[in-house]
Amino acid sequence: AGTQASAKCCTSDITLAEFRRLKGKMDGVNPNATTPEAYINGTPDWRTDLYASRGTLMTHAESIELFEQLGTKFTPELKSPSVEMPYGGGYTQEDYAQQMIDEYRAAGVDPADVYAQSFNLDDVLYWIENEPAFGEQAVYLDGRYGDESFDHADPSTWDPDMADLADKGVNIIAPPMWMLVSTEGDDMVDISRKSYEFFV
């Protein structure tokens, strides 16, 4: 009693045919649930599931084709694997990072339209080194705010710091919005500008 419900639902051995039989639903859970069915039936009351309970799942390659038709740019995030890497005896993190880029190459997408993203700095550095046309605008999603020694308002705690990242070829860094601005009294303070000035 008093403990919120939680669950982790994933698999590493699903086939493409099995994946295609699934239906997408709006993300949301009921933390007060006592059954699996109630847990996944967690759409907030102010939303509707009328159009969000039978979504057709797509592969990454299929999503590229759709976005090409819609004329959009691409911001794919290489998700952290839920399995130990290398997986299955030989599939490495580098293979995983390369596979994502290969699908854009196979579709003939202009690298300038792709902003590959990852919270794993090594992924971004891999793209910079091995796929420079894509790596030039690869995005480092900065998740270091979870580290105890990291203070987003104190550049002396940043490792690597902005200068180090720039030296490694990282041109775009994306921290959460709350790390970029703060308040002092009634004034909004641009932390990102203050941090930039720290290194100039």
Model-predicted segments: where are they?
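C-terminal active-site rim and adjoining tail of enzyme catalytic domains
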Residues: 94, 135-200
